[in-house]
UniProtKB/Swiss-Prot annotation:
GO CC annotations on file: ribonucleoprotein complex; ribosome
Pfam families, alphabetized: Ribosomal_L34
Keywords: Ribonucleoprotein, Ribosomal protein
Gene designation per UniProt: rpmH
Family, per entry: Belongs to the bacterial ribosomal protein bL34 family.
Organism: Colwellia psychrerythraea (strain 34H / ATCC BAA-681)
GO molecular function term, any single one: structural constituent of ribosome
Database matches in InterPro entries: Ribosomal_bL34, Ribosomal_bL34_CS
The protein, known as: Large ribosomal subunit protein bL34
The UniProt record lists the keyword Ribosomal protein: yes
Length: 44
């Protein structure tokens, strides 16, 4: 049985990257929450 996590930098960036987050209203909300919390890394 193959493992479920098959890493790919491209897919990671496209789905969870900063630009992907900023593309939608909810994504921007995610960034705002993480900024408010003081996260060192805001996105993948």
């Amino acid at each position: 049985m193959k493992r479920t996590f098959q890493p790919s930098v491209l897919k990671r960036k496209r789905n969870h990257g900063f630009r992907a987050r900023m593309a939608t209203k909810n994504g921007r909300a995610v960034i705002a929450r993480r900024r408010a919390k003081g996260r060192a890394r805001l996105s993948a």
